[in-house]
Amino acid sequence: NYDQNTKEKTTKPSVRYAEGQSMSAIWAVRSLGIDPGTGNELFLTKDGYLTYTWDSDDQIVCGDELPKYTGTFGFNLDWKGFSVNTSFYYRLGGQMYNQTLVDKVENCDMNNVDHRVYTGRWTTPGQKAEFKKMTDPNYFTRPTSRFVQDLSELQMTSLNIGYDFRNCKFMQKGIIERLKLSFYMNDVFRLSTVKTERGTDYPFARSFSFQLQATF
């Protein structure tokens, strides 16, 4: 169910289930970007006509959050007492709606704004801008394909580096049977086609630790 009241008030893509469409489809009105002459956003109706007016009935599927491919891989290396173990995660294909970017720039609280409110928005006729003018008649930015972005990413989810001192000369004295030093880190890095903005979401939980194992 997707009633008219919800369609007109929402500023983010709503979950919609339509026959023959993906359950993770992103519904929005197609956008041609910001008109350099007026600073208003230029839309395409579902029939292909140009308009400055956002209409909920013109929403179509503009992307899908479900990636085409996902997977994990890693490698292990042991050499002269050194060991390296890594794990990676990847996703290819699919899209995301960059809602945080919308909320920080075009739907922002004017008492707490992002610098792009002043540097990235349209101000002068003929200007090519990423964001619409502040006096756009469609004041609140509603679901638009302008913020649907292709998402592919690679994450290094864990890294473990260790050194086993078993071949060191001091180990031959027999006081210590085994000694190994290890370093562990998770969420090492993320490479993404979308500049992810956390907003009020939890930050990426990167952590690291050292471990010393000794056997006497």
Regions found by a protein language model. Name each.
Residues 69-71, 80-82, 152, 175-179, ...:
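Outer-envelope beta-barrel architecture signal
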Residues 78, 89-91, 184-188, 215:
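Outer-membrane beta-barrel pore domains and translocons
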Residues 81-85, 168-170:
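Repeated loop/turn-to-beta-strand initiation elements of outer-membrane beta-barrel proteins
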Residues 86, 181-183, 212:
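Membrane-embedded beta-strand positions of outer-membrane beta-barrel proteins
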